Amino acid sequence: MLWSSRKLDEQPHSTSVSSMRSFWGLMFAYWRSDRWQEAWGLAAIIVVLTALSAMASVWFAEASGELVSAIAFLHHPENPTTLKTILSSAASLATIVVVREVGFTAFRHLFSTTLHRKWRAWLDRRFNDALLDSNHTHFHLQQGAAEAVPTKVAVPDNIDQRIQESIKGMTGGAIGLAIGVAGVALSLFFVGGKIIETSTEVSGLEFLGSYGSACLTVAAVVAYVPISTLLAAKLGEIQQRLDVRMQSAEGSYRRDLATLLHRSFHVAAAKGEGAQRGLHRRRYLDVDHTWANLNILTAIYMGFELVYNFFGSRLVAYAPGLLPYVENRISLQAYITGAELANAIINDCSWFIHVMPDIARLRANATRITDLAKAIEDAQQPREFYARTGHSELRYDQQDPQFGLTIQQLELMHPGDDEPFVTAGNLHVKCGEWTLLVGDSGSGKSSLLKAINGLWPHGRGAIVMPRNVRTLYAAQDIHLPPVSLKALICLSDAIEAHSEAEAAAALSRAGLADFVSDLAMEGRDNQSWDQLLSGGQKQRLVLARILLLRPGLLFLDEPTSALDGEATVAFHQAIRDHCRGATVISVMHDATPPKSASGEEFYDSVLVIADGAVTKTPLANLTTRPVGPARVKPRP
């Protein structure tokens, strides 16, 4: 069952993503998990390499000062430098650059991408576990109306894009930003210490003593960086909104393309390329409009950042040391070294400005992920979840298997409606009974089967299932996932639960002996089984699954619609022979129900839907199929 009313009210619900419904909960979930040693171990290595990179920035500034000073004094009349000294300084600078970029930065990138890969994999497993749980959360999220989830985005759109792209972008962005924060802190420590160490007095600021030039550097940074940071934050807010819109538009367009590829035959058969082309144009128009706005903002931000970098590195960085240099308190080498250190401080403090687009994307990705986590948690109580869009008072219970299946005062409704479109009083299907479910097309036969199996959200009444009896629901539309043929037969069991011989025997009994050698294959000729098999072959595959799993309670929704009369009889006879004692409820549109080769009836009774009411009669009373109201009501 999808949900049981008694158990839902008694047990608290918690999913594998419960802690990820807030920004910081999402950020820290991995670091507090059972993989914390892996996470913190990689993080520690990254911090150490970041510290070494910060120290290398100090070495770089000192080496740059030595090289510029050596070049400046090459033609000094009293104490000229030699070419050997210049080459030695250049070699030292080159060595520092190689060690910093290759030994520190490149290896840090390797460890950070490894952390990115492992963090993403952990989150991917958690969200897949939450969506593909026994509560069928993925189904509820797809069925829920837009107003069913009280979040800003309601039922999350493009769940695939959120799990694939948003998680990847969020984890990568978070790691990059964390490295940036660590780099700023460590660089301020090492570079700031060097600035204080090389500080000197400045005229007019004698009361600061030897810390005069250091204070000037701090003042220049404090005056320059915050104003620019505020402007960057405003632009970042706009970019975050555009990023969210862009992800939604891209996800919708990709979803329609994927749907086309899965249904290309139906589009071709209906000559629906024009309609599909129009849909794609509308989807891409949304992408293009959002992209244009994003490009304008990116260009504005790029111009702002380039101007900011130039003034910071060429004017602000060199200004604090200019006064003591003019007063001849420091040498040219000390002046250049101080300017490079000031430039490093400005770059570090400007980290927020440089990564503002990344922060905007991080927040956009995190918002889409946390909204999905909220929706997953919200759908853990399906009755309350669906009650926001209509009556959701269906109750599910269990009873002794010998009493079979019982339906009590059942009413099925559409979202937002108060009147039922299908009603049933007290109905009982005995253990081992075969019951035919008939009614006009659209009268609610499939909806009734869905409701019995917990897949219809709105209505009232009680459904009592036999306890500890395996059920199998064969839906009307058969869509096969891209897995091996054996896995398709074994669903919902694990593939290891049944031997190759058992699976091969089930295939043969179902009339698919030609495919026995392909049990381990996921298709043929670059086509999946869903693309390769015909409608009749898919129904035979469902029969093979039934024969392998041997359920005690079987629900069939037009199971032989693609089979001829002889194959239909063989289908029913195989179930009768190999699933002895099973209870069967089957939807069929045939004018007369099938009989065995000896003329015996397969079915014992009939559930008839007429004028929206379900009644049960013996099979002998079946005359013609009744006419009922359409299941999908026309809008007024």
Language model: regions and residue ranges:
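A hydrophobic transmembrane-helix motif
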Residues: 48, 61, 104-105, 179-210, ...
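An intracellular "coupling" helix at the cytosolic face of ABC transporter transmembrane type-1 domains
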Residues: 169, 242-262, 268-316, 358-361, ...
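A short, proline-enriched helix->beta-strand linker immediately N-terminal to the Walker B motif
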Residues: 548-552, 581
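ABC-fold ATPase nucleotide-binding domain signature/coupling loops
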Residues: 146-151, 481, 503, 510-541, ...
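Membrane-integrated ABC transporters
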Residues: 1-57, 69-93, 108-112, 138-185, ...
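Cytosolic ends of transmembrane helices, especially the final helix of ABC transmembrane type-1 domains
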Residues: 266-272, 316, 336-382
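ABC ATPase nucleotide-binding domain helical subdomain, centered on the C-loop/LSGGQ "ABC signature"
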Residues: 470, 486-528, 572-573
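Helix-to-loop junction immediately C-terminal to a conserved catalytic motif
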Residues: 453
